């Protein structure tokens, strides 16, 4: 038996749906999981941290068609965008799984066949209501005013042949398991919701295949069916670590399953605490030890959504505040159970009060005084006073409290405790007044001891901070010229090496910000985007048309517009424009230059060779200082995404659209 082996710990996030760029509310989950994973590593666990993307479904098939690309091309682009955001936020995942990965698709097919062969899946017909954005089926009794109970969007009637999973068969066993394992669903309020709203009233069998679209994993023995999202997406947690239902699973699966923690949003907890454990029971696999449904990060008027126009993106916030400031904010402001709120005002407030003042100023003052009074040398002269014990007690108690909080997944409370070290250290400076001690040569040893205690307290605080703000932690420790302390060694105060020398020039960790300046930049950013939109729409719409309420026109008016098919032969970005692409479009025997506000959805190199619908008799106009000789037609979905209007069949450029 291996006596020195680390205990495995498997943590996963929900895999992100590849319908668009993730906003800061989505990003919160990966940052939260990263903080937990990093802390578990500090505790000595052998951590495996998995995240990824959910890439199949009708919604993606429709979005890809609107964009004029294949579903695989569409999800490749979005998955890359999601991974870039996860990497920008400095998250330490070990695996980024995509449900279009070949090994995942093969295992899903084998799992489907196994469950069918053992009688847990059967063929039938579905008739009811369906929400495409949520990919959820509903009965008429569950729907109010024709709207999806989850997202509030309209549902549509659906009727199709489908395979179903016998949920009802396993419901009693799951109820028994939840009652015997109260830690399985957290927080407790989520457990009560699942029991009272779904399990106790009785489960209906679950649709696990579709025939009304093609973008999915085919059912091997009935290929007109594709595997529905839940049997596909949920199984990533086992396929990603090498599960094989034929009994040939990788050593990684044997080592890490069952998962220690599935970290998910509260809106998908039903699928992870009812459907997923029942699938696992049917496969004869142990259930994950805990599923935690975290709250939402809201922006003032509710849940973020593109349709509401209240979306904030991580990369935008990072441009303003930096990676660790954004990490601190989302981790600090999100309670254990209730939703948190994000706003520019609150972020600036935290930046100034917590990061620049409490933390940054403390480090700067300590390093500066050490250089000023002792040439940067830190030395404990043993000139102790009772106030020192209060500082030491706060630090050592905090180490224990942080450990307790993190074991209970109370991450916001843990980071608050860490900042109590920095608050107490600032108070210690006020209590000991090093600048006064420096005036008295007889108190030089006392001054040295005070600065040693401050350096030691900051070292322990910065070491604790690593799981939450890794870059800041490393910067602080570099200024103190010391290594990150292990959790075990944090339980002892006074391990900072005597005679060590801090950096000569302290680095400003966080600069104070003026809310007026920030809001001016934010408003300028919004205004620039709005102006560009307005300029583009001005050209795209008939002059004099009332955009808010378009007047009726006669057929003769419509007949004045000429629509033709054009082939894009060259395309490039417009300098200094965030939204415009400049395309050279061949229309019959002539080539025209046309500007379009589609940069966010299409790369220039992807435009070349496309055939598009063009309004060819518009009066030329200047956009961003460049001449545009027509308009390329696009469609806009309810989330503001644009898709080129392309002919269903290949036709010659110059062909008239009628």
Predicted features and spans:
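Structured secondary-structure scaffolds
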Residues: 2-51, 103-107, 151, 157-372, ...
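N-terminal catalytic cores of NTP/NDP-binding nucleotidyl/phosphoryl-transfer enzymes
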Residues: 2-78, 97-112, 117, 134, ...
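A glycine-rich helix N-cap at a beta->alpha junction
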Residues: 78-94
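Short secondary-structure capping/junction motifs at helix and strand boundaries
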Residues: 89-98, 116-129, 141-142, 156-159, ...
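Cys/His-rich short segments
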Residues: 118-171, 175
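Helix-rich, typically C-terminal accessory recognition domains appended to large enzymatic cores
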Residues: 123, 346-383, 394-502, 615
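Intrinsic disorder at enzyme termini
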Residues: 476-557
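Phosphate-backbone binding interfaces of nucleic-acid-interacting proteins
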Residues: 536-658
């Amino acid at each position: 038996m291996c006596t020195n082996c680390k205990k495995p710990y498997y943590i996963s996030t929900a895999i992100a749906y590849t319908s668009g760029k993730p906003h800061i509310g989505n990003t919160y989950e990966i940052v939260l999981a990263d903080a937990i994973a990093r802390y578990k590593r500090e505790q000595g666990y052998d951590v495996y941290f998995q995240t990824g993307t959910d890439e199949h479904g009708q919604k993606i098939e429709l979005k890809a068609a609107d964009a004029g690309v294949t579903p695989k091309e569409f999800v490749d682009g979005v998955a890359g965008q999601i991974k870039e955001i996860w990497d920008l936020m400095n998250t330490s995942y070990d695996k980024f799984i995509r449900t279009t990965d070949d090994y995942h698709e093969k295992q899903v097919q084998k799992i489907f066949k196994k469950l069918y062969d053992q009688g847990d899946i059967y063929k039938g017909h579905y008739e009811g209501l369906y929400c495409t954005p949520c990919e959820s089926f509903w009965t008429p009794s569950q729907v109010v005013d024709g709207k999806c109970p989850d997202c509030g969007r309209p549902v549509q009637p659906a009727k199709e042949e489908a395979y179903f999973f016998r949920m009802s068969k396993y419901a009693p066993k799951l109820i028994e398991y939840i009652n015997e394992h109260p830690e399985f669903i957290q927080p407790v309020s989520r457990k009560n919701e699942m029991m009272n709203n779904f399990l106790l009233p009785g489960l209906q069998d679950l649709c696990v295949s579709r025939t009304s679209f093609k973008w999915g994993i085919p059912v091997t023995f009935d290929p007109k069916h594709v595997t529905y999202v839940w049997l596909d997406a949920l199984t990533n947690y086992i396929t990603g670590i090498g599960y094989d239902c034929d009994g040939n699973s990788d050593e990684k699966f044997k080592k890490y399953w069952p998962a220690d923690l599935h970290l998910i949003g509260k809106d998908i907890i039903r699928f992870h605490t009812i459907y997923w454990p029942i699938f696992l029971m049917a496969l004869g696999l142990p259930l994950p030890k805990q599923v935690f449904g975290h709250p939402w990060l809201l922006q003032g008027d509710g849940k973020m959504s593109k349709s509401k126009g209240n979306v904030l993106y991580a990369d935008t916030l990072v441009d303003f505040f930096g990676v660790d400031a954004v990490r601190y904010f989302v981790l600090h402001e999100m309670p254990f159970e209730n939703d948190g709120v994000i706003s520019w005002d609150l972020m600036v407030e935290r930046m100034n009060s917590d990061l620049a003042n409490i933390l940054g100023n403390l480090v700067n003052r300590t390093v500066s005084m050490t250089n000023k009074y002792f040439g940067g040398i830190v030395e404990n002269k043993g000139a102790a006073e009772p106030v020192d014990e209060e500082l030491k007690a706060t630090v050592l108690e905090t180490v224990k409290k942080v450990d307790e909080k993190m074991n209970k997944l109370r991450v916001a409370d843990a980071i608050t405790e860490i900042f109590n070290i920095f608050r107490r250290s600032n108070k210690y400076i006020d209590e000991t007044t090093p600048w006064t001690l420096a005036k008295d040569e007889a108190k030089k040893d006392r001054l040295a001891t005070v600065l040693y205690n401050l350096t030691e307290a900051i070292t322990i605080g910065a070491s604790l901070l690593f799981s939450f703000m890794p870059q800041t932690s490393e910067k602080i420790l570099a200024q103190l010229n010391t290594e990150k302390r292990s959790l075990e060694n944090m339980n002892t105060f006074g391990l900072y090496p005597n005679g060590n020398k801090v950096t000569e020039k302290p680095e400003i960790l966080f600069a104070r910000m003026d809310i007026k300046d920030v809001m001016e930049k934010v408003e300028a950013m919004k205004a620039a985007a709005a102006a560009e939109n307005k300029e583009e729409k001005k050209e795209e719409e008939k002059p004099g048309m009332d955009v808010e309420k378009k007047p009726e026109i006669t057929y003769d008016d419509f007949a004045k517009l000429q629509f033709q098919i054009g082939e894009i032969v060259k395309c490039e970005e417009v300098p200094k424009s965030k939204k415009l692409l400049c395309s050279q479009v061949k229309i019959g025997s002539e080539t025209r230059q046309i500007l379009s506000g589609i940069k966010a959805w299409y790369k220039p190199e992807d435009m070349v060779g496309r055939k598009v619908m063009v309004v060819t008799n518009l009066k030329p106009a200047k956009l961003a200082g460049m001449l545009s000789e027509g308009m390329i037609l696009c469609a806009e979905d309810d989330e503001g995404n644009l898709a080129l209007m392309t002919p269903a069949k290949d036709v010659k450029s110059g062909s008239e659209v009628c």
